[in-house]
């Protein structure tokens, strides 16, 4: 953590692995397809502290989304364990209870397009068992926090891309979770919506919440993250503060540090070209 002091571990993952099976194209001679097992995530362990923003970096297909889905208990790991601290500092591992402490956002998050943002949040409040008066107060707070006051009563199907993304994030906030897990939350957004989401993540950090998020925007990660991990082929190949990554790679910014880390890991010109094609 940037602020120093002994940190409270909010979420801990030990030796996470996720194995998938993919079908390989038919052999021209035998006209048979074959199945190959592979690990999208291969023995990853992380601990994230209260009030910390952790950035998850890596090229497409590196395993970022699979890792985040396992941390959010949306996907069950093949092996490994995940635990989270509640607001009362109680360690829990039951996936159902873990979900109650997490706000998760992915690119596949579905909204109720026929409802207004406010109506959707009210419905989610009922699902979480939040009292009506408390729910209305939460909606007003969230609307102000994410700069949604101008469109909170508009139907979701009429919102812009950036407004829809803010509504998606609002969906994660209604139950006041301790940990936020976001998969590329600013991808493809205009600067106003992107800045609103960045401001939100900084605000949550200042309130002691934990944020884990993936991004391809290195400048954003350098500015926002207390710590980053770089994933390639399902493994962590580097971790540390943005400054430590830059120092270890003798680079002047995180983007250069990212490229240099991948190049160092590839060990050779052929692998270097392969890596560039992924980015």
Regions found by a protein language model. Give the residues of each.
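Helix-to-loop junction immediately C-terminal to a conserved catalytic motif
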Residues: 72
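Conserved ABC transporter NBD signature motif
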Residues: 80-91, 97-98
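Conserved ABC ATPase "signature" region
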Residues: 122, 126, 133-151
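Conserved ABC ATPase signature
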Residues: 155-159
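Catalytic Walker B motif of ABC-type/P-loop ATPase nucleotide-binding domains
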Residues: 180-184
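ABC ATPase "signature
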Residues: 239-240
């Amino acid at each position: 953590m940037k602020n120093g002091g002994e940190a409270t571990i909010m979420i801990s993952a030990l030796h996470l692995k996720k194995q998938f099976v993919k079908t390989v194209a038919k052999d021209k001679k035998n006209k048979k397809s074959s199945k190959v097992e592979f690990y999208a995530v291969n023995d990853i362990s992380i601990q994230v502290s209260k009030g910390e923003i952790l950035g998850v970096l890596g090229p497409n297909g590196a395993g970022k989304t699979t890792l985040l889905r396992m941390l959010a208990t949306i996907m069950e790991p093949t092996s490994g364990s995940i635990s989270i601290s509640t607001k009362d500092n109680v360690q829990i591992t039951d996936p159902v209870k873990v979900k109650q402490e997490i706000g998760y956002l992915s690119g596949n998050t579905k909204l109720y397009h026929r409802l207004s943002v406010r109506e959707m949040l009210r419905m989610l409040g009922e699902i979480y068992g939040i009292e009506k008066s408390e729910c209305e107060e939460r909606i007003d707070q969230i609307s102000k926090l994410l700069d949604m006051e101008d469109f909170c009563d508009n139907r979701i199907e009429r919102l812009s891309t950036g407004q829809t993304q803010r509504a998606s994030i609002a969906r994660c906030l209604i139950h006041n979770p301790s940990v936020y897990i976001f998969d590329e939350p600013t991808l493809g957004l205009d600067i106003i919506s992107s800045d609103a989401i960045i401001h939100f993540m900084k605000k949550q950090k200042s309130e002691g919440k934990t944020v884990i998020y993936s991004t391809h925007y290195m400048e954003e990660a350098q500015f926002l993250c207390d710590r980053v991990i770089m994933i390639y082929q399902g493994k962590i190949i580097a971790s540390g503060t943005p400054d430590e990554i830059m120092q270890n790679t003798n680079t002047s910014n995180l983007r250069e540090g990212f490229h240099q880390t991948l190049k160092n890991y590839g060990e050779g010109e052929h692998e270097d070209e392969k890596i560039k094609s992924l980015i």
